[in-house]
């Protein structure tokens, strides 16, 4: 109700997805307002259900798409497990333990790139390259600015970065052959 009212929405800077979430069974956990119950009391009365990567991504990306001028954070159930979903959905402050300074500098300058598949999500920037979170073994044609790139793999659980190809020349696009699910970083050099 607040975000649909332009006057009140103007004072909202951050959308915090905390007290509701999509469930893996396709339903929504959303306690009714005005019941004078704390979130823990609602959780005793209504089954909370589980939220997976896909559900976290959906929530963040929907709000970022609908309200592009607002920061979106997710602190719902098991939020530390959904850092990649928050990042790939365009959210702010994802909980990720990637210890690569170049990655941490590049990612905030990237934007969500809409794709017509659930096989992967992508964020990219002309000067930074692209990050893809891939869920299926497949070949992906990634549109990129012409230049030199390093192809890196980031383990989604440990956030360890490993170099697959250190120096590759790209002209307009790169064909990424996915040999294992996870996060691929095409780092512009």
Give short role names for the model-derived ranges.
Residues 172-174:
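Short strand-edge motifs at loop-to-beta-strand transitions and within beta-strands
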Residues 1-29, 80-91:
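Substrate-binding cleft/loops of secretory-pathway carbohydrate-active enzymes
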Residues 16, 21-53:
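Glycine- and acidic/polar-rich repeat regions and solenoidal domains
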Residues 40-52, 58-73, 79-165, 177-189:
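Aromatic- and carboxylate-lined catalytic core of secreted/periplasmic carbohydrate-active enzymes
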Residues 168:
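Short acidic-hydrophobic, aromatic-tinged amphipathic segments that line or gate anion-handling sites
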